[in-house]
Each structure stands twice: as C-alpha cells, then as structure tokens.
C-alpha cells in the first residue's frame, strides 16, 4: 500500500486487491491558490465533513460522505460517527487497517473509541484547536488508540499556513519520528511489532 499526504486532511491511498489497483482519496479539496492535481483518478472518494470545497476529480469515483459500511472492489470502508458531524473512516485493505480521523476538533467519547481501537495505521489531524485537534489532545488520542504507526496530517503547509507546525505535536507525543518521507510504502509484514512508530510525510504536490 502507498500512502501520501496532500495537505490539510487530504490523504491518498493506493492499494491492490485481487490484482486490481484501487485508488482512494480522502477529503480532496480546492486550495485557495492553484488547482488540486487531476492526475490522480480515484475509484473511491471519501469525505469526512461533507463535500463543500471538494476538489473536482476526473472520472466518476464512488463517493462516500455518510455513515455506514461499504465494500467496493474488495476494500472494506466503515464510516463511523465522530464529534461535531465529523465522519471517521476505518479502511481495510491488503490485510492492513487504516483509521482516518477526518476533520476532528474534539476527541470522541470512550464508547466510540472502541470502534477504532488498535489500527495498524492512524491518520490524525494535529494542526490547531480551531479546525482540528490541538497538538496536546491529538497526542493523547493517538496514545489511547494504540496504533502501530502514527501519521500526522493537517499541520502547517503551503495550503494550510495557519495550522500549527508538526513540531508541536511531536513534542507532545514524545516519539522521535522516522525520517520524513514523500510517501509511505508498506505491507502487513513491515508493521512494527512491539513499538509505535511516528512517520512524518512531506506534502505531495
């Protein structure tokens, strides 16, 4: 599986199931300057908080923007409620479980945490308390969910200059990040077994 961060809460997943490539785009958006790249044509487009300001995508992807359980091209997608009308996505593909917390501002209640506990990979917004989780709250939630890999999203970048820098979250989490990568390429066998890894992705495009 390939995982890339495209700024804000937007993430691109490239996976293969039964010899078929499946491209997934989460929270594609229209930046204030420039255009969202159209070279990526997803089969699935997921939105955590509605489609306002959604990017224009080529082809006609299957869109998920409501709660429920979906199976598309042998990829399982569970859309579960978060706080303040935010949707949390739990995605199962290639034997991996990925949880994307969406545009979360407030951590879910303990009962809701059980639905997303123990993912292989956690994509968590860490940028601020206005649009996303505060770094301190994000670190506490990441620890509570016990993922094997943590990938912070929605921190400061050229399309989100008002968000807090990634350094604030790293300091709160207390984990030394792996070297910054342009994308994460991972298989089930590559997951850490005894520790949690923090991986910081460069914004793509």
Model-derived features: where do they sit?
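Portal/gating segments that form or line small-molecule/metal binding sites
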Residues: 55-99
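Active-site-proximal loop/helix segments of hydrolase catalytic cores
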Residues: 83-145
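Active-site metal-binding motif and surrounding structural segment of the metallo-beta-lactamase
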Residues: 25, 29-69, 114-123, 127
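Divalent metal-coordination and catalytic microenvironments
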Residues: 13, 45, 77, 103, ...
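Conserved beta-strand hairpin/beta-sheet module of binuclear metal-dependent hydrolase folds
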Residues: 1-33, 85-102, 121
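Active-site environment of divalent metal-dependent phosphoester hydrolases
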Residues: 12, 31-35, 50-56, 106-108, ...
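Active-site metal-binding loops of divalent metal-dependent hydrolases
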Residues: 28-30, 50, 82, 101-105, ...
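Binuclear metal-ion centers of metallo-dependent hydrolases, dominated by the metallo-beta-lactamase
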Residues: 3-9, 84, 145, 149-205
